């Protein structure tokens, strides 16, 4: 029987951005006779510098996401039976055809050496995925001892030991353990294993019945346990006597710990026995990526650096990817690899997606506890989607909410523009454009003194700054350019809505606005081109409380404001930071 077919809506949206005839591959999850397509790759014929093909790309996917089909965009020629040979997840591979002009989608399953059309294609969104699946982030440290540069051989042996089941898995939030030999644990489902009726385990400020944390990824934490001793009743122990071999010779030895950080996408109804196999597979994928990282280093350098795993989710991508870089490599040193990933995944070549700063933040990460990311995502949307004249532009990507009294620093009454500037800098950091730290008030003041904008007594003062100074600091510290919009009254701010709409659609950066003695951050605009009605999505830096998302949303510290929000007798300047063109 042919499987049921589900396709993530992000896949279709990404296909719309491909303007030429190409072939590629599909990747998805097969569970309970339902194939869910999550992503695709493109066959790149001229990428000779970095060897990333459809099979190695699968290693970057969470475990349980496999190569599942073939993709044709536009007019293509390819022998389908030959193309299906690398697909193991199903006996009925998927053939997916997308036509540009009509945005037509045709899907076929390859059954008994014939293509059978799929009549019912269920297009789903990310929230639908999370109703059935959850990410599991498995981490641990594996000891390695290498001699005379045999690192690849040692990694292969380590992978074989892992695959043979010589590890255990711990779920710390529930104090639950999973082993290869489950004599004492009945074969329960993942949902039962995690007991998901318990309070949300991520951000401490987000508890049961409250808003979910925004801008971060929620994943189940798991740890790797190494088996130190053998099973007491193992046949190996009964039949074999210990043997000690002593060889005296000179050799070079290196000892280190291999850091494992890997992902799985598991169905809540998956049995614990199957789950163990999936988690083992995730470790093996991670080790293979680490092997490739070391092999690439051996070809280009005599100095070896440990491999570090990072997880990424490009904007509108729909799922996570794992990428391994040599520890300490700069963005310049990883550029060729990142460019190849952009090409094979059909991503924009003018924006960075896989720099260190682009790595996702998890709810369980310690740094997430002290700051909120993208609080506007928690606002209930009530847009009139049927109104074709209403246009909406929203900040693109991640930012951190900076406001009064953070960092144990009292700037209540004078530091609002400083905090808005910090929010903007956080956007550039989280999009991978810079690794410059978030500037403190003192650093901002020193910068303005150094460029000659302020006198020396400005440092350590409580003097305000405005949008002009914000632009100076951005240009000086980050090297980015800005544009400035001016409104002589609060009513004129609404007249600049088309300019703001264009900014958010093209640049996507937060906008700092200053008027009178107040500064705010504009995150978006909702504009009706016919009636002129406009609303502004405002992030207010004057908030003095803790990082409590429900309070921030319900009390209006982050929310949509009408044109009456702006004072009629105030003069306003807006600083519109520009997005660099780079990868």
Briefly describe each language-model feature range:
Residues 48-370:
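Long, charge-dense tracts
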Residues 2-44, 387-460, 475:
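Active-site nucleophile-adjacent alpha helix/oxyanion-hole segment immediately C-terminal to the catalytic cysteine
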Residues 122-123, 148-151, 156-157, 183-184, ...:
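Short coil/turn segments at secondary-structure boundaries
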Residues 533, 538-583:
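Low-complexity, Gly/Ser/Thr/Pro-rich intrinsically disordered linker/tail segments
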Residues 11-117, 125, 134-144, 150-154, ...:
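Active-site-adjacent substructure of cysteine-protease-like catalytic cores
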Residues 407-418, 457-468, 491-495, 507, ...:
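Intrinsic disorder
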Residues 349, 353-404, 409:
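A compositional signature for long Ser/Thr(±Pro)-rich, low-complexity
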Residues 424, 428-433, 452, 478-482, ...:
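Eukaryotic basic, amphipathic alpha-helical target segments in cytosolic regions
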């Amino acid at each position: 029987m042919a499987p049921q077919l589900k396709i993530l809506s992000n896949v279709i949206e990404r296909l719309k951005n491909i303007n030429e005839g190409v072939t590629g591959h599909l990747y998805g999850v097969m569970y309970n006779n339902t194939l869910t397509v999550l992503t695709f790759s493109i066959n790149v014929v001229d990428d000779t510098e970095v060897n990333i093909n459809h099979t190695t790309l699968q290693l970057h996917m969470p475990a349980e996401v496999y190569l599942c089909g073939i993709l044709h965009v536009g007019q293509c020629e390819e022998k389908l039976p030959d193309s299906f040979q690398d697909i193991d997840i199903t006996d009925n591979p998927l053939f997916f055809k997308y036509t540009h002009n009509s945005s037509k989608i045709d899907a076929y399953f390859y059954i008994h050496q014939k293509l059978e059309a799929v009549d019912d294609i269920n297009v789903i969104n990310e929230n639908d995925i999370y109703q059935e699946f959850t990410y599991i982030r498995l981490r641990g440290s594996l000891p390695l001892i290498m001699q005379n540069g045999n690192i690849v051989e040692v990694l292969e042996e380590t992978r074989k030991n892992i695959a043979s089941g010589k590890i255990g898995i711990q779920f710390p939030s529930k104090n639950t353990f999973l082993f290869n030999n489950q004599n004492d644990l009945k074969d329960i489902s993942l949902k039962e294993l995690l007991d998901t009726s318990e309070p949300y385990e991520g951000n401490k400020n987000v508890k049961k019945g409250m808003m979910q944390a925004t801008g971060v990824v929620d994943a189940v934490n798991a740890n790797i346990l190494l088996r130190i001793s053998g099973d007491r009743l193992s046949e190996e122990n009964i039949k074999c006597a210990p043997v000690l071999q002593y060889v005296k010779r000179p050799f070079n030895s290196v000892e280190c710990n291999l850091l494992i950080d890997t992902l799985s996408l598991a169905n809540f109804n998956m049995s614990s026995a199957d789950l163990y196999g999936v988690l083992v597979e995730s470790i093996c994928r991670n080790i293979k990526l680490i092997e490739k990282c070391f092999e690439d280093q051996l070809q280009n350098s005599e100095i070896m650096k440990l491999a570090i795993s990072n997880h990424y989710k490009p904007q509108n991508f729909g799922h996570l990817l794992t990428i391994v870089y040599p520890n300490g490599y700069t963005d310049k040193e990883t550029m060729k690899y990142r460019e190849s990933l952009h090409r094979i995944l059909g991503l924009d070549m003018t924006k960075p997606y896989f720099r260190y700063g682009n790595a996702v933040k998890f709810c369980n990460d310690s740094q997430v506890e002290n700051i909120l990311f993208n609080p506007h995502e928690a606002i209930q949307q009530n847009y009139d989607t049927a109104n074709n004249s209403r246009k909406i532009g929203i900040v693109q990507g991640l930012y951190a909410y900076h406001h009064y009294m953070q960092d144990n620093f009292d700037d209540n009454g004078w530091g609002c523009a400083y905090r808005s500037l910090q929010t903007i800098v956080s956007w550039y950091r989280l999009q991978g454009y810079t690794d410059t730290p978030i500037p403190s008030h003192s650093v901002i003041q020193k910068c303005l003194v150094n460029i000659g904008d302020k006198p020396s007594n400005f440092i350590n003062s409580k003097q305000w700054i405005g949008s002009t100074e914000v632009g100076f600091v951005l240009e000086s510290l980050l090297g980015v350019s800005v544009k400035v919009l001016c409104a002589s009254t609060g009513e004129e701010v609404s007249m600049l809505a088309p300019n703001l709409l264009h900014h958010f659609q093209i640049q996507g950066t937060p906008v700092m606005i200053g008027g009178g003695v107040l500064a705010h951050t504009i995150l978006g605009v909702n504009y009706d081109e016919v009636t002129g009605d406009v609303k502004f999505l405002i992030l207010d830096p004057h908030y003095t409380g803790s990082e409590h998302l429900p309070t921030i949303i319900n009390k209006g510290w982050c929310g949509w404001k009408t044109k009456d929000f702006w004072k009629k007798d105030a003069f306003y300047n807006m600083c519109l930071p520009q997005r660099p063109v780079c990868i």
